[in-house]
């Protein structure tokens, strides 16, 4: 069974919203970590907001030229997009709409053979899938920055969930990537 790994940026005070604030922390080490996790995956799982942002960037000549094989991989991987408002056909290459019972659709995807699926941010989708026990690992890129306001990674009222720390990676710029597996229920 393939897993679902979430990768998301967060400030020290728990804010994930509009991660443009993370750009000053990008480094060669961060790029290598991002590359490794992308190559360990054979599909992307995205919510509508993340899909729209990525679809507007990754397929452009500018991004392909700048990001090289990383952009090529982002563009070529199958992308499964959870949305109630988007309509098919989706514009970004190899994108598939999950419009019905998303938890059921994702559970079926997990049963397919292959590598793990990677989910960037897509926090509302992450919350919904966590409620159904479908998220396997959460990789939090903790930035040494306090934003003071914005949407938090874990909303009030979310079900208590036990996590097990399985890996930490400290990048030279002070970002710490914390990898947590969802503990057995």
Give the positions of each predicted feature.
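Portal/gating segments that form or line small-molecule/metal binding sites
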Residues: 1-134, 144-185
